[in-house]
Amino acid sequence: MKTFTAPEGKLVTVLVDGVEVSYVPGQEYPDNAEFVVTSPMTNQPASFDKRGIEPYRAAVMVNEQGVDEANSVKGAIQGGTVTADGMDGVEIHSTSDDFSAVVSVGGKYTIKNSVLNFDTKSDGKHVCDFSGYGSVLAGFQGAQFTVEKTQINSVGVAKPALFCDDRSECLFKDCNVTVRGGKLYDGYVNSANQKTMVAPPWVLGIGGNARGINLEGDRGTAYVVDTCFKANQWGVLSTDAGQNMHLYVADSDMILLGENVPFSDTKDPYSTKYGSGYGSYIIGNAYEEFSGVDIKVGTHGAVLRGGTAVYKSSKGTIKFVSPITGETVYEAPGKGRITRIDCEFGVMAHGDGKIVFTEGTEVNANNAVFLLKSGGVTCDVEDGAKLNSGNGVILQMMDDDDNLVGAKMTDAGPMFNTEFNEMPGWPSENGQITSKMPAPSFDPMAGGPGGPGGPGGPGGPGGPGGPGGPGGPGGPGGPGGPGGMAMAKPDTFLNATDVTLNGNVYNGTGYYGQKPKPLFVTLGKGAVLNGAVSATETRHIDENGNQNTHFTIKEFYHLAHVENRNFFNGDNTVEVTLKDGAVWNVTAPGIINKLTVGEGCTLNGTVTENADGTLTVAPKA
C-alpha cells in the first residue's frame, strides 16, 4: 500500500487498474495505483463563474490547439484508439465525484463506439452543473462534440452527461444515455442559488437531482438523433443560465425513470409511472424543437420560462442548422414518427413564450395540457394534434403558487420557504380577490400572518415573481434561471386550427395578491372545441379532490393541482373568437367577456348577457 502527496497548486487523479478513483490526501492505495498530476486551468472557462476556477480534471482535455497532453489523464482510457481528433471503441470508468471524460475549451472532438461509465457517489458537494464541473462531457467557448453509437452511464448528484456553454454544440447520434442521480448530502438547502443548487427548486413541484443535458451561455446547443436519453428525476434535457440556447431532438426517447427515489418521494400520488420532473426546460429565449420524440415524464412535459418550443413529427427530412456557424450539422430522412408526451401536465409555464403542438403531436396528460402560471404565453395547436386530458382541462390559467410559497432573502440569495398555506374556502369568499385586497404592509417575500394569501400575501405588487423576481440573479424562477426576469406580458393566447379539442379552458387568475391575466381563445379553420370556456376561481386540492390548505416541501408534488369554480373577479377576462368555419360545441356553462362568431362558424350553445356585462355561454337545452 502507498500514499501520495499532491504538489502544491496541482491536481491529482488516481487510477487503479485503469479505473479512476477519488484522491484523498493521506489515504492508502494499492501498490499498483497510479497518481497523475495535472495543472488547474488559469481561467474559469464557463460563463457561470461565481464559484471561481473549478478544478476540472478529465481523461482528455481539449483546447483550440488540440489535445492538451500534459493535462489529460489518458490512463483512464481503456482499449480502442485515441487520436488528436477523438476516441473510438474505448471505455472510461470513473468513480470520483468530479472527473470528466472530455473537457473542451474551444476544441473539436469526436467519441464513437465507446462506453463512458461514471458510477460515483457524488452527493452534490463537489460538483456544479451550472459550470460543467463533474459533467461527463463539458464544452466551453465554441467547443464542438460529436458522440456516436456510445453508451453513457452517470450515477451521482448533478452529474449530467453533457454540459454545453457559450457557442458550444454537441451532436448525439444513435446513443444510449442514462443519468441516475444520487443521494443529496445532509443539510442541503433547497434554493435557486446557482453556486450550490444541485436539485430543482421545490416550488416547481418536482424532485430529484439529475439532468441529462444542461445548455447555458450564449447559444449553447445540442442535437439528439436516434438516441434514448434517460434521467432519474429533475429533468431529461435542460436549458438554463444563458440566452438563445438551442435544443433539437429527433426520432428519440426522453424518459424520467423514477428509480430508487427518497422515501418521501414515494408518496407522490401523481408520478407513479415515471420520475418526477420535466422533459425539457425552456428559458432565456431558448428555441427547442422535437420531431418524432417520445417524452415520458412524471410531471411536466416541459417547463416554459422564456422561449419557444415546437413539437412535430419526423416526417420528411430532418435538418439541423447550427445557430452558431450557420452550417448544416445533420441532414437525413426522418422516421415519420409523431411526438408523444405522457405526463401529469403537458407544459407548465411560469414565464412567457410560445408552445406549438403540430403534425399529429399527441399529449396524454393526467391533468391540464397547458398549465399557465404566467401571462405572455401563446399556445398554438394545429394540424391534427391530439390533446388528451385526464381531468378534462385543456388549458388552466392560475396564479403562480411558486410565488405563494415565497422566499427569504439571505446573503447567499433567496431561500424558499418550506411550506405552502392557503385559506379555507374559495378566494371570492375569504377575501383573496387581488383587486379587493389591501397593499402588503410587510415583506411580501416572507408571507403574511396566517400564511400566504393573508392580507398582502406573497406575490402581491412587488412580491416574488414581480419585475426582477425574488432575489434578482438566481431568483426562484426555474432551475437556476439567469437572474430575475422582467414581468411577462399579461395577454395569453390559445389558437387552434385543424384540430378537435375535447376539454375545458379556464382563466383562474387574479387572486391571492397576484395580477390577473387576459385570455384570448381563437378557433380557426378546421377547429372544433367540445368543452367549456370560463373565467374561474381556483383553490388547491389533493389527490382525493379535497381542498389542500397546507403542505410542506416534502409534499412538493401537490403544487399546481387545483380545482375551478366559474367566477369573474372583474379582471380575469376571457374573449372567444370563432372564424373560418370553426365549431364550438358547448358542454358546460362558462363566463366570458366577449364572443365573436364569424361567418360560416357554428356555436352549439346559448348566450345570456349578465348584469355585469359578462356573457354566460351554456349548452343548448
Which residue stretches match the model-derived regions?
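All-beta strand scaffolds that present successive hydrophobic residues in beta-strands
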Residues: A6, L15-V16, Y23, Y29-D31, ...
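Acidic/polar low-complexity surface segments
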Residues: M41-E69, N117-Q141, D166, V177-D218, ...
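Residues in short coils/turns that link rungs of repeat/solenoid architectures in beta-rich domains
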Residues: S94, F118, S154-G156, V179, ...
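Extended alpha-helical scaffolding regions
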Residues: K230-A250
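Extracellular beta-solenoid/beta-roll
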Residues: S389, D491-T492, L501-G503, G510, ...
